[in-house]
């Protein structure tokens, strides 16, 4: 697996797959005029290709997750203020979570993008302060973890729950089947 994300590792373990995890080093900068869909798919493919070069006989799973609201790509918070800015934007609104998934093997590379719409309740400054104090928002796209404390802020989603966690399992299995790595 081309990821050091504990959440992605936990999700893959649910499938009963044996795997090793490697963190690829790639440039995650957004390219000029790049859509969120193109961005997450490009990063997933770059991550997979980077690790496949090191382990050419392996099957590599890679993913990247970002949010989009008002046409803007929202990644991980860089500071407390950045997290608060993100939450202020998400507060009381719907946003979309996109994951690019790539499964790469020596004979084939397949990828796709999955979208889930997430509704956030209106957050007070006290909500934001308390949530920040938990440490949970760090390292998470959109500065929240749907599988954790932030679940209390999300009344509904439309689409794949595991996509919002960071690895849409249904689509991952479909890609593994395409490279004949899953029955």
From Swiss-Prot:
<keyword id="KW-0546">Nucleotide metabolism</keyword>
<protein>
    <recommendedName>
        <fullName>dTTP/UTP pyrophosphatase</fullName>
        <ecNumber>3.6.1.9</ecNumber>
    </recommendedName>
</protein>
<feature type="site" description="Important for substrate specificity">
    <location>
        <position position="147"/>
    </location>
</feature>
<keyword id="KW-0378">Hydrolase</keyword>
<feature type="site" description="Important for substrate specificity">
    <location>
        <position position="65"/>
    </location>
</feature>
<comment type="function">
    <text>Nucleoside triphosphate pyrophosphatase that hydrolyzes dTTP and UTP. May have a dual role in cell division arrest and in preventing the incorporation of modified nucleotides into cellular nucleic acids.</text>
</comment>
<dbReference type="InterPro" id="IPR029001">
    <property type="entry name" value="ITPase-like_fam"/>
</dbReference>
<comment type="similarity">
    <text>Belongs to the Maf family. YhdE subfamily.</text>
</comment>
<dbReference type="InterPro" id="IPR003697">
    <property type="entry name" value="Maf-like"/>
</dbReference>
<keyword id="KW-0963">Cytoplasm</keyword>
<feature type="site" description="Important for substrate specificity">
    <location>
        <position position="7"/>
    </location>
</feature>
<dbReference type="Pfam" id="PF02545">
    <property type="entry name" value="Maf"/>
</dbReference>
<feature type="active site" description="Proton acceptor">
    <location>
        <position position="64"/>
    </location>
</feature>
<dbReference type="GO" id="GO:0036221">
    <property type="term" value="F:UTP diphosphatase activity"/>
</dbReference>
<dbReference type="GO" id="GO:0009117">
    <property type="term" value="P:nucleotide metabolic process"/>
</dbReference>
<dbReference type="GO" id="GO:0036218">
    <property type="term" value="F:dTTP diphosphatase activity"/>
</dbReference>
<dbReference type="GO" id="GO:0005737">
    <property type="term" value="C:cytoplasm"/>
</dbReference>
């Amino acid at each position: 697996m081309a990821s050091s994300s504990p959440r992605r590792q936990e999700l893959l373990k649910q499938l009963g797959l044996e795997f090793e995890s490697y963190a690829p080093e790639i440039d995650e900068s957004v390219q000029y005029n790049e859509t969120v869909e193109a961005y997450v798919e490009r990063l997933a493919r770059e991550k997979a290709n980077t690790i496949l070069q090191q382990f050419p006989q392996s099957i590599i799973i890679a993913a990247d997750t970002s949010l989009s609201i008002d046409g803007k790509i929202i990644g991980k918070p860089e500071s407390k203020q950045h997290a608060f800015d993100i939450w202020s934007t998400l507060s009381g609104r719907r946003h979309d979570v996109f994951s690019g998934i790539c499964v790469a093997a020596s004979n084939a590379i397949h990828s796709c993008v999955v979208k889930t719409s997430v509704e956030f309740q209106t957050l007070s400054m006290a909500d934001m302060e308390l949530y920040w104090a938990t440490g949970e928002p760090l390292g998470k796209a959109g500065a929240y973890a749907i599988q954790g404390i932030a679940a209390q802020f999300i009344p509904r989603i439309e689409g794949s729950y595991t996509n919002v966690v960071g690895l849409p399992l249904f689509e991952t299995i479909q890609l593994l089947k395409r490279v004949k790595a899953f029955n």
